[in-house]
UniProtKB/Swiss-Prot annotation:
The keyword Lyase applies. Homodimer. Belongs to the class-I pyridoxal-phosphate-dependent aminotransferase family. It comes from the Eukaryota. The modification N6-(pyridoxal phosphate)lysine is found at residue 279. This is 1-aminocyclopropane-1-carboxylate synthase CMW33. Induction: By tissue wounding. It comes from Cucurbita maxima. PANTHER family: 1-AMINOCYCLOPROPANE-1-CARBOXYLATE SYNTHASE-LIKE PROTEIN 1, BIFUNCTIONAL ASPARTATE AMINOTRANSFERASE AND GLUTAMATE/ASPARTATE-PREPHENATE AMINOTRANSFERASE-RELATED. Its EC number is 4.4.1.14. GO terms for biological process: ethylene biosynthetic process; fruit ripening. GO terms for molecular function: 1-aminocyclopropane-1-carboxylate synthase activity; pyridoxal phosphate binding; transaminase activity.
Length: 493
């Protein structure tokens, strides 16, 4: 059964949300995942499979989490030592969450920010992961048709998380490589004016700090510019800070919470923070999303809405114990930062040897890789052609910049912290062979007549890297079926 097909009968029977493409998943960002699901790399069982470099997971310090759990079996209600709390934890819990969990989260958020700011546990609101928390905030702040200004490039799934069910809009604040994609006041004003001219009501600005996909942090002046901008226009500022503990080198991460305390005339009720343990602790499966708002009404309403996506009490109980262990938290944060720095340095150093540069970054679990020189021309069409070869032939799931709405073709987000060292070696070897092959083809075309050279340039990305061409038939029979509008499917037509 091909679940992506919606016939006329279902078009009439179902809601607009159920039948439209507002989910935003018809993009190379999600199709790369599906390509991996259909042909996952395994060093022994499937050594020629697709390596997952499109998933922003932090698995580098997972051993520390496992070791802590092994030493503290009482933290789980599903072990003999934790059973005495089973009934009290398994019973219905208040929407506020376990007090010890909210205290632990507030303490952890403060530690991640170097103790430079404190968080009030009474303002902690839970959500079903950062996705659920993000959507809840949008429901609290905007009506269908209202818009948020979002600097681009931005997290590819925002099109789903922020827009699909809320029916809000995203208006891009265009940033470019001339200043390393930094947000400027001029760019904000241009986007705001564009919305006004289209008679669209702007309800706020949304940023990710540290940035996904750039891996950079906002400096103090830019954050103050953003606060001043929202104050002047009396709109909200939502700061997604889920990568705040992934900073691995200078400059130090600055939270919007610090700016709120520093600025004398800041309208605090306009500031909201999104947080999660998915990236900072590498626990995406626990679905811990956090809303921290300085607006009392938002805190109250978000808490009521959280009934649609609560964090399980068992998860809260375990994490409350873990986060209250200050010695463990201190060691984890320091070691995690060290491991991220080492992996990032190793990965970018090897890319540099191949002539591939990345945006200078200091945070996150990915690099913003510059492959503009490999495009046959500077267009997004050429970017998609290159991406298809990387997916289908090089067998690496990397995410093209177009899926993050970047303004310049040729940038790719590549995740480096979701695999072991051996898999990193395989991935780097594949990239090296790929680039070397292209460079050789370029060298061989230099002496060709111009007409022949043009033909070779068009074909230079069509070589068979692995000796196995992508079998679209297998994709269409997979339980992870791609939409007929998928860039990977369209590529074959």
């Amino acid at each position: 059964m091909e679940f992506h097909q919606i016939d006329e009968r279902n078009q009439a029977l179902l809601s607009k949300i159920a039948v439209d493409d507002g989910h935003g998943e018809n993009s190379p960002y999600f199709d790369g995942w599906k390509a991996y699901d259909n042909d996952p790399f395994h060093p022994e069982d499937n050594p020629l499979g697709v390596i997952q470099m499109g998933l922003a997971e932090n698995q580098l310090s997972f051993d520390m989490i496992v070791d802590w759990i092994r030493k503290h079996p009482e933290a789980s209600i599903c072990t003999p030592k934790g059973l005495e709390r089973f009934k009290s934890i398994a019973n219905f819990q208040d929407y506020h969450g376990l007090p010890e969990f909210r205290n632990g989260i507030a303490s952890f958020m403060g530690k991640v920010r170097g103790g430079r700011v404190q968080f009030d546990p009474s303002r902690i609101v839970m959500g079903g992961g950062a996705t659920g928390a993000s959507e809840t905030v949008i429901f609290c702040l905007a009506d269908p048709g209202d818009a948020f200004l979002v600097p681009s490039p931005y997290y590819a799934a925002f099109d789903r998380d922020l827009k699909w069910r809320t029916r809000a809009q995203i208006i891009r604040v265009h940033c470019n490589s001339s200043n390393n994609f930094q947000v400027t006041k001029a760019a904000l004003e241009i986007a705001y004016k564009k919305a006004q001219e289209a008679n669209i009501k702007v309800k706020g600005v949304i940023i990710t700090n540290p940035s996904n996909p750039l891996g950079t942090t906002y400096d103090r002046d830019t954050l103050k510019t953003l606060v001043t901008f929202v104050n002047q226009h009396d709109i909200h500022l939502i700061c997604d800070e889920i990568y705040s503990a992934t900073v691995f080198k200078a400059p130090t991460f600055i939270s919007i919470a610090q700016i709120v305390e520093e600025m004398e005339h800041c309208k605090k009720e306009l500031i909201h923070i999104l947080y999660s343990l998915s990236k900072d602790m590498g626990l995406p499966g626990f679905r811990v999303g956090i809303i921290y708002s300085y607006n009392d009404v938002v805190v109250r309403r978000a808490r009521q809405m959280s009934s649609f996506g609560l964090v399980s009490s068992q998860t809260q109980h375990l994490l409350a114990a873990m986060l209250s262990d200050e010695d463990f938290v201190d060691k984890f944060l320091a070691e995690n930062s060290k491991r991220l720095a080492e992996r990032h340095a190793r990965f970018t150093k090897e890319l540099d040897k191949m002539g591939i540069t990345c945006l200078n970054s200091n945070a996150g679990v990915f690099v913003w890789m510059d492959l503009r020189r490999l495009l046959k021309d500077q267009t997004f069409k050429a970017e998609m052609e290159l991406w298809r070869v990387i997916i289908n032939e090089v067998k690496l799931n990397v995410s093209p910049g177009s899926s993050f709405h970047v303004t310049e073709p040729g940038w790719f987000r590549v995740c480096f912290a979701n695999m072991d060292d051996n898999t990193v070696d395989v991935a780097l070897n594949r990239i090296h062979s790929f680039v070397e092959n292209i460079d050789k083809k370029e060298d061989n075309t230099v002496a060709m007549p111009s007409k022949t050279r043009r033909r070779e340039n068009k074909l230079r990305l069509s070589f068979s890297f692995s000796g196995r061409r992508y079998d679209e038939g297998n994709v269409l029979n997979s339980p992870h079926t791609m939409s007929p509008h998928s860039p990977l499917v369209i590529a074959k037509n």
